[in-house]
Amino acid sequence: MSTQMSVFLSTQAAQPQWGEKALISFAEQGATIHLQQTQDFSAIQRAARKLDNQGIRTAFLAGEGWDLESIWAFYQGYRDAKKRNTVEWKALAAAEQVELEARIKATDWTRDIINKSAEEVAPRQLATMAAEFIKSLAPDHVSYRIVKDKDLLTEGWEGIYAVGRGSERTSAMLQLDYNPTGDENAPVFACLVGKGITFDSGGYSLKPSNMMSAMKADMGGSGMITGALGLAIMRGFNKRVKLILCCAENMVSGRALKLGDIITYKNGKTVEIMNTDAEGRLVLADGLIYASEQKPQLIIDCATLTGAAKNALGNDYHALLSYDESLSQQALAAAKEENEALWALPLAEFHREMLPSNFADLSNISNGDYTPGASTAAAFLSYFVEGYQKGWLHFDCSATYRKSASDKWAAGATGMGVKMLARILMQQA
């Protein structure tokens, strides 16, 4: 079969020889995607996956019906980690073309950096690459610093340093300031905090190989939240925002974090380490303390934080946890408007009491049988957010990465959540 093909949309059923309710049929002029209803974006994305699997390397979206959202759905399904495919389409209206190109630029960056190997993206490289991406979009409005290695201790960022001290690759914290106001004293509207664990072996609480194989993607929260800020900037976002990425590699060595160690955080909280594989919350705590120091109206953190969230929701939804019910409802509405899957998991005050330690203020994991891991992880983070009951959203990113392909997604990073977070920023401003 040719590696180039025109692709058409139709709401008419395929001819019988293609099978009952066939999604795709082929003819001399190209392939036709048969939709059960107009604007069936899921079907378009599934059809794009089928075309990729059949070796079609260039698709021209021809005929009627290809608007912004249908082109986007096709692009999402057609793209794979090897970036072998090219999509071409007829010109859209100017505003729609700008929006489509912005989506592609932001999500491609997110998917690419998550798909890179841990050898390519060490903690300092992640911080640098994220900063350079955002600065490329608004060079006159972005400044940043990267705090690394022993400087983390000097400035009080004990969690990031402790998690990464077992690796030969130094840990880093990105502190990026996007300030389009022209006023260096302008208030910070929002702080965006990302977990940036560039590889997670589990530390001494070692992961089995089948659980470790995808852990280059444990920085997916940083990738997602950086991409979202980039998309918001390209959409014209004009409020001051700080991006904080907490970057480390969780490895085993004679210097690595051990069970029973106690971390003393900048806000005075002490944490006993009862599981070194619950490291994401340890680095995020530093980022949330820094975010709280900025006194923003809004704090959003993103992290591939718990297996519990993925067990609950699979790879198809991101999890949302927040004490702010009104803000949560607005976030869920934003996700729906962007056609991205988000589901709220419970977070209550009693979850904060499920992290007892005999030697510190908190344990880094909850105790007991059948504890709600995603909820207690979010509750742990709340101890590092000033005024945690209002203006804070925590995303446990279950849908950033897929170890194997599905009918809608190639294996690897998805870019899901970038549009949703960008919309939340725009709507809250």
Swiss-Prot record:
Mn(2+) 1 binds at residues 200, 277, 279. InterPro entries: Leucine_aapep/pepB, M17_PepB-like_N, Pept_M17_PepB, Peptidase_M17_C. One of its GO terms (cellular component) is cytoplasm. Its cofactor is Mn(2+). It catalyses: Release of an N-terminal amino acid, Xaa, from a peptide or arylamide. Xaa is preferably Glu or Asp but may be other amino acids, including Leu, Met, His, Cys and Gln. Pfam families: DUF3663, Peptidase_M17. Keywords: Aminopeptidase, Cytoplasm, Hydrolase, Manganese, Metal-binding, Protease. The keyword NAD does not apply. GO terms for molecular function: manganese ion binding; metalloaminopeptidase activity; peptidase activity. GO terms for biological process: proteolysis. The keyword Phosphoprotein does not apply. Its EC number is 3.4.11.23. Its main location: cytoplasm. It is found in: Cytoplasm. Binds 2 manganese ions per subunit. Mn(2+) 2 binds at residues 195, 200, 218, 279. The active site is at 207, 281. Belongs to the peptidase M17 family. NCBIfam families: PRK05015.1. Homohexamer. Probably plays an important role in intracellular peptide degradation. This is Peptidase B.
